[in-house]
């Protein structure tokens, strides 16, 4: 059975809350990801800014060169552990209507898992068939 660690991505796209939305989008494009992790010593924990957050700001006519990530990021996150079954993490994503979860090993942030990662490694349907056999 595949685990979260088999599909998760490294923490490449990282920004701070004072980065602009344009800077966040450039970082996400550079790393070919749909989300950037937001880190800052003043935050209680890591947050995320996603493609959806950027699209909402654009649709509202906001200036991506003036708007700060901190005003658009998501702070209440669903998290996973590297050893979780991939199916469990995917189920949580569907249940909560999200496409990204942060992966923690104990207190340490070790990666990010996206629905794109789940699809990339595939095998969920194959895992379900194997479990049923």
Give the predicted meaning of each segment:
Residues 42-43, 107:
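Glycine-biased flexible loop/turn sites that connect beta-strands or occur in inter-domain linkers
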Residues 37, 102, 114:
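Conserved beta-strand segments that form the floor/walls of ligand-binding pockets within enzyme
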Residues 1-11, 46-79, 85-94, 109, ...:
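Tandem CBS (Bateman) regulatory domains
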Residues 39-41, 51-52:
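Acidic/polar N-terminal loop/beta-strand segments that form early-domain functional surfaces
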Residues 33, 45-46:
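Local beta-strand N-terminus motif with an aromatic residue
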Residues 15-32, 38-39, 80-97, 104, ...:
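The conserved cystathionine-beta-synthase
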Residues 14, 102, 111:
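Conserved SAM-binding loop
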């Amino acid at each position: 059975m595949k685990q979260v660690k088999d599909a998760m991505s490294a923490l490449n796209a990282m920004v701070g809350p004072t980065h602009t939305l344009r800077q966040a989008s450039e970082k996400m494009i550079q790393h070919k990801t749909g989300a950037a992790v937001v880190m800052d010593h003043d935050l209680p924990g890591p947050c995320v800014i996603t493609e959806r957050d950027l699209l909402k700001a654009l649709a509202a006519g906001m200036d991506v060169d003036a708007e700060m990530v901190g005003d658009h990021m998501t702070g209440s996150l669903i998290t996973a552990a590297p050893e979780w079954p991939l199916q469990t993490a995917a189920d949580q994503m569907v249940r909560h209507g999200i496409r990204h979860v942060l992966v923690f090993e104990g207190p340490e942030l070790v990666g990010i898992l996206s629905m794109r990662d789940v699809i990339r490694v595939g095998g969920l349907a194959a895992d379900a068939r194997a479990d049923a056999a």
